[in-house]
Amino acid sequence: MKKNIFIALLFIGGLTACSDNNEGSDIPDNPGYPVTHFSKIELKEVKEEPGAPAVTVTQTYDYSAGRLINFTSTQSFVAGGELFKIENATNVVYGDHQAVVTDEINNISTYTLDDNGYAISCVRQEMDGKIRSYTFDYLINTEGKYFLKNITETLDGNKSYSSINIDYSSYRTLRITQQVDKSEQTYIASTSTGNEIANTSEIPYLFLTDLYPLSFHSVAIYGKFLGDAYNTLITDLRPEDNSGSNETTTYTYRFDKKDVDISCSELTKSYGTDLSLIHISEPT
């Protein structure tokens, strides 16, 4: 959950699906791995704070043959009338039952994939020599979709340090429990009762990549080798124990004529104060 106060704009753009007649589509028949039907997903966040220049953070996910191949994160700001940009690139290389993610500073995450292209484990080798190991577990529905149910992180080969468990017992209300070292926090993510919104664009939940240890795996989440996006869109998120703060986050969505999710507004309130206001919309 975001604790700092800021106002941001977040854009999802480049959601270019295959043409209706599939002409020119590079997605093979029966690909044997989870497919994303967009050539690019772009998220743009503009952070504004008093006394500091606005910083634009752009995250771009590029796909080929329905698979994520590149991720680029760019920070840009204007100071003294000059535009500054800081860019970090991450690439994904696929092998036999394997996806290798290498970032700008040579942190290497090697995912072992099952026969359907979903990760069952990962070893992350960081530039300072630290090794993080992960295991993943899924709920598989009747349509054969994989929904991430558990991630467990082990440090230096033997110390279980963190985990996230997602309880799908109620499809309208997900219970997400995050454990880091000896602390634990549970979040309740829900959709409107009797008015579920179908996630036709199959965009991952934005808040998942903010939760440690999933924060190390945003590329895998957007690459779908950590499972498929859930069938419905979340409209409310809150800590299970929010009796003191009454903290809640609400999401509203806007769609194009093909029911592709092109706009979302996120509003977090705590102790009666707006903590963040985020709008997601298509670039103009």
What are these regions (language model features)?
Residues 21-281:
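Buried hydrophobic residues that stabilize the cores of well-folded domains
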